[in-house]
Regions:
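Intrinsically disordered, low-complexity segments enriched in serine/proline and basic residues
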Residues: 2-3
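Intrinsically disordered, charged low-complexity linkers and terminal tails
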Residues: 19, 56, 168-169
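Short N-terminal edge-element motif at the start of the domain
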Residues: 7-48
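Generic "edge-of-domain/loop-turn" microfeature
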Residues: 36-38, 48, 56, 80-82, ...
Length: 169
């Protein structure tokens, strides 16, 4: 069902009435990319996913092979769209995925106001330089993940990743 629109005097509110797709942590996902190749991800503790440094020209369902690859990034993903991501299997999450995921937030008005936090509840104020290399707290749409994976595999910058980097000045 498409989003429903409600109009007010000065603005438009879009209410998404679709239900999210919920994947069990440990699920493996095959992600079709725009060039016809495939990337692979793993559902972590919701809402986080991890994406492997693994790309194939034909679909692969070998969970051992996929799980042996290094992780490119861990991000929050909103699984809402009717896309062609395929659930290809499940297994318990390995020890490497029990480590907290560390991210940052940065105030839009005062770039010096940063917070580093993790998925187990730790949080502290930080200088912008301390946030370099961390993921900004953001929820990605599936199409954005597809673009980011393909850009990474093609060795080119991703517009969303660049836009979300910490501001240093």
């Amino acid at each position: 069902m498409p989003p429903q629109r409600s109009c007010g005097a000065n603005s438009t509110l879009i209410r998404d009435t679709r239900m999210p797709r919920i994947y069990k942590p440990g699920s493996f996902l095959r992600v079709p990319l725009a060039d016809g190749s495939f990337g692979y991800g793993r559902v972590l503790k919701l809402p986080h996913d991890a994406y492997y440094d693994y790309r194939t020209d034909t679909p692969d369902s070998d969970l051992d092979r996929i799980a042996s690859k290094p992780i490119l990034f861990k991000i929050m993903v909103r699984h809402m769209e009717e896309r062609s991501w395929e659930l290809i299997g499940w297994r318990e999450l390995e020890e490497q995925f029990s480590q907290p995921i560390v991210q940052f937030m940065q105030d839009i008005g005062n770039f010096r106001d940063c917070t580093i936090f993790d998925t187990v509840g730790n949080s502290r104020r930080a200088e912008p330089q301390e946030c370099v290399g961390l993921e900004r707290s953001a929820v990605w749409e599936e199409v954005g993940v597809e673009e980011r994976l393909l850009d990474t595999f093609m060795g080119r910058p991703n517009d969303d990743v660049e836009r979300l980097k910490v501001r240093l000045k």
